[in-house]
């Protein structure tokens, strides 16, 4: 929803954007700008995530992106993207030239998510140039497109559906409305997949090469194919206008050559966008595409200030600081008001001029400190016409409905090999009871790869019994990665040790495979979840004789499945729909898992002694048998630390003491966990060496934390940074707990506030779904097709549209902004809340 604008601006909008002369300039940041409208060209590098090519930001909202040559009418995540070779921005001529080519051999049948390129080879340049109040986009090819690909190759511009549903469009003289769902009819054509490139990576091992028969499987629907069936265009013409009724979103594209066609990408990808497309004509090279994009620039528009606070609130003893994000052209710094909400309405609790912090990304920032306000109650901050969400100040602010949804909802919903009920509701039925078969040797999807050897007694395709127990689905994809399974159990174990979590709202029966949300069973929920993680790791080790790399579905049709996890397979072991189990030789991951299991063993003692003993046994074995190299030494130290804390055995202590110089030189990675061993070992020389290194590390953190108005190290790249910031705060707790004279609590609180809403951009939602006054209630989880959420899941958060636009869209299909994950996504958040609760109550 568009944010309300200042009254003056609203009164002027009816006159359109022609009050003053408009003129796009190529600014110092490398994109075209005129007041509140920006046109980027190939700044972003993530086209499969709808971040790339030519992009258009209209008055604070990214409405179009991925303007580039594509080989399908409506490509998705799995379709070929070009290789970007060079980008040259020339402020003197107001031009950005980008040089690209097809195919990209580094992605063909290899890589994290392999693609299949057709046998089509050409180079091209995309030229974007400011022309007064418009941007001209031209495309030049180095050769004509072969006849068999005419109609397949075209220039696409993707339009963000979330802001356009129900909005009008015009194509020449025809008008229409962007529909909520994709509507037929469909068109059929010969797919590029039938002309696939036969290039073989002769220099790559078998685990770096995809299996075309599996990846490109023919027959029923396969997401790797996006051009055999597409939506019929909603309209065709030469001049297309988006939102002719809205001066804030209106822009026009005129094609001086090929006809424009408006497609709906959701016809063959549920997560697709609307696509405006012009095909490359036969024989064309020079100006094969020639578009003039004319955005409506509202000259009087200015970004409305955004008041950023925690959506939950603050403990009275907690430092309290609101961040106010304003347009860098806005020179009017006003006083801010803090109101207390009473039964009689608002009462002014404080009025104060915020301090100017300076510029970060594209905005100017102000800081409003109200730490002196300690009276319990409901509050709201006003700055000009802008209001924060309502928040609490109270000693009990973290006592209910803040960390608890992680245990009450998110972790139970994510449990694999279970049926999960919530009273009337079934979150998912019995699932993946047919886990698993041994993977084939190949480069699979989502980063999975199996080498020439299975590293076990099992051959490719063999049934591996005993894997259908425990674990949690990776929230978007349903797979089980070793680091997410053991890592989740580890973080929960550390939370139990640090805070003694006593909470029971869920019944979990591992024998009957039934989980009942809000049906207490007299057992600790957090320990039952630690047990759930331990079960899959230990079962995998016992079945395979080693750790699994992960368990994932065998093909893309299963991988993109939306909905009930129980629908992915038939739960009958030994047939073609079974998931695959992968193995690897990865010393770092094996030793990290050893560290996790050592901690798990501690907390399960007395709760599930058998599992506790097995966890420690496997941890010891991994520590002894895993070869250590330069890349895995940190993990060896981590394993030794946790094993020493669990066993107090001298050999682990001696190893740590012998490595004190290495530990000191890598203190930024090791410092957070070594402190507990430092205390327990009580070795003066070791402690002194570490403290010198820690003091230097503290200085580096303070320097980075000072780079942003949020008081934490934060250097956005592409993905939302919420998970990394949570992890930073989690580690800061251990540094503070071990070395309180060096590391204060501010970073813990600042990291928590960031996740709960005090973060860049106009969307100040809490990243924790269902937590706070406004939260991310559209998430990339199992129910994303319904534009819904899982309470207690924590999304990735505000992303960066390069080079400087912070964005958090209300849209369920952008994994880099709204995905939930295991192995820290929610558990680091829960830990942070528990840490704040403990620290603040201690000083009450």
Give the location of each predicted region:
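Beta-strand-rich N-terminal accessory domains
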Residues: 22-91, 184-230
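Extended, loop-rich substrate-binding clefts of extracytoplasmic carbohydrate-active enzymes
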Residues: 73-144
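Carboxylate/His-rich catalytic cores and anion/metal-binding grooves
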Residues: 485, 523-548
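Short Pro-Gly-centered flexible turn/kink motifs
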Residues: 139, 280-295
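Low-complexity, Pro/Ser/Thr- and charge-rich linker/hinge segments at domain boundaries
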Residues: 163-170, 300-319, 388-426
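Aromatic (Trp/Tyr) and acidic
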Residues: 206-248, 256-259, 267, 312, ...
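Bacterial N-terminal signal peptides
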Residues: 7-16
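Acidic (Asp/Glu-rich), glycine- and aromatic
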Residues: 136-186, 385-397
């Amino acid at each position: 929803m568009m944010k309300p604008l200042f009254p003056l601006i609203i009164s002027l909008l009816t006159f359109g954007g022609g009050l003053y002369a408009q003129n796009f300039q190529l600014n110092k940041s490398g994109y075209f700008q005129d007041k509140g409208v920006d046109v980027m060209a190939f700044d972003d590098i993530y086209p499969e995530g709808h971040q790339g090519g030519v992009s258009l930001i209209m008055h604070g909202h990214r409405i179009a992106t991925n303007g580039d040559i594509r080989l399908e009418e409506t490509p998705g995540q799995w379709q070929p993207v070009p290789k970007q070779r060079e980008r040259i921005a020339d402020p003197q001529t107001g031009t950005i030239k980008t040089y690209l080519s097809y195919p990209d051999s580094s992605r063909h049948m290899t890589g994290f998510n392999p693609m299949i390129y057709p046998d089509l080879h050409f180079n091209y340049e995309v030229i974007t140039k400011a022309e007064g109040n418009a941007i001209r986009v031209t495309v030049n090819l180095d050769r004509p497109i072969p006849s068999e690909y005419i109609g397949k190759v075209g220039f696409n511009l993707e339009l963000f559906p979330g802001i356009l549903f129900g909005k009008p469009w015009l194509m020449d003289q025809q008008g229409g409305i962007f529909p909520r769902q994709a509507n037929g009819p469909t068109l059929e054509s010969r797919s590029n997949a039938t002309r696939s490139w036969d290039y073989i990576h002769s220099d790559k091992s078998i685990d770096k090469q995809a299996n075309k028969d599996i990846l490109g499987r023919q027959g029923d629907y396969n997401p790797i194919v996006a051009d055999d069936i597409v939506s019929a265009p909603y309209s065709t013409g030469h001049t297309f206008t988006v939102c002719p009724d809205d001066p804030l979103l209106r822009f026009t594209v005129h094609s001086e050559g090929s006809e424009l066609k408006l497609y709906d990408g959701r016809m063959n990808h549920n997560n697709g966008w609307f696509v405006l497309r012009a095909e490359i004509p036969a024989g064309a090279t020079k100006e094969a595409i020639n578009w003039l994009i004319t955005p409506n620039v509202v000259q009087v528009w200015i970004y409305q200030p955004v008041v950023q606070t925690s959506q939950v609130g603050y403990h009275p003893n907690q430092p309290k600081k609101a961040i106010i994000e304003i347009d860098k052209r806005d020179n009017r710094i006003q006083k801010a008001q803090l109101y207390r909400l009473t039964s009689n309405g608002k009462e002014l609790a404080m009025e104060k001029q915020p301090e100017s912090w300076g510029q970060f990304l594209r905005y100017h920032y102000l800081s409003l400190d109200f730490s002196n306000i300690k009276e319990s109650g409901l509050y709201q901050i006003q700055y000009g016409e802008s209001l924060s969400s309502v928040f609490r100040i109270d000693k009990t602010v973290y006592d209910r409905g803040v960390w608890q949804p992680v245990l009450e909802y998110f972790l139970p919903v994510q449990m694999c090999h279970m049926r999960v009920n919530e009273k009337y509701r079934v979150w998912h039925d019995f699932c993946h009871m047919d886990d698993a078969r041994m993977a084939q040797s190949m480069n699979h999807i989502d980063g999975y790869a199996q080498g020439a050897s299975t590293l076990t007694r099992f051959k490719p395709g063999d049934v591996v019994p005993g894997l259908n127990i425990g674990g949690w689905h990776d929230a978007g994809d349903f797979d089980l990665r070793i680091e997410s399974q053991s890592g989740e159990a580890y973080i929960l174990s550390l939370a139990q040790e640090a805070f003694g979590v006593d909470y029971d709202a869920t019944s979990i029966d591992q024998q009957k495979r039934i989980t009942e949300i809000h049906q207490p069973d007299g057992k600790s929920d957090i320990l039952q979840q630690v047990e759930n993680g331990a079960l899959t790791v230990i079962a995998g080790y016992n079945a395979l004789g080693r750790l699994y790399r992960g368990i994932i579905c065998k093909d893309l049709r299963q991988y993109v499945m939306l909905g009930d996890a129980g629908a992915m397979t038939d739960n009958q072991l030994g047939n073609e729909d079974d998931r695959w189990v992968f193995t690897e030789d990865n010393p770092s991951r094996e030793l990290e898992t050893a560290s996790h299991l050592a901690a798990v063993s501690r907390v399960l003692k007395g709760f599930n002694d058998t599992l506790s003993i097995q966890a420690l046994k496997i941890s010891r074995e991994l520590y002894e048998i895993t070869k250590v190299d330069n890349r895995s030494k940190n993990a060896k130290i981590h394993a030794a630390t946790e094993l020493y804390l669990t066993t107090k055995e001298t050999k682990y202590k001696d190893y740590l003491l012998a490595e004190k110089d290495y530990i000191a030189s890598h203190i930024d990675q090791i410092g957070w966990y070594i402190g507990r061993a430092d205390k327990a070992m009580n070795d003066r020389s070791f402690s002194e060496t570490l403290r010198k290194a820690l003091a230097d590390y503290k200085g580096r953190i303070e320097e980075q934390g000072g780079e942003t108005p949020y008081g934490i190290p934060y250097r956005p790249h592409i993905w939302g940074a919420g998970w990394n910031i949570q992890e930073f705060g989690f580690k800061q707790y251990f540094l503070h707990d071990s070395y309180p004279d060096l590391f204060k609590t501010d970073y813990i609180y600042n990291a928590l506030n960031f996740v709960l809403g005090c973060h860049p951009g106009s969307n100040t939602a809490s990243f924790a779904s269902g937590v706070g006054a406004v939260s991310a209630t559209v998430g990339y989880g199992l129910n994303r097709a319904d534009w819904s959420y899982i309470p207690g899941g924590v999304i990735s958060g505000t992303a960066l549209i390069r080079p400087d636009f912070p964005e958090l869209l209300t849209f369920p299909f952008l994994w880099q902004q709204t995905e939930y994950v295991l192995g820290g996504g929610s558990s680091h958040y829960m830990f942070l809340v528990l840490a704040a609760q403990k620290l603040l109550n201690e000083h009450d």
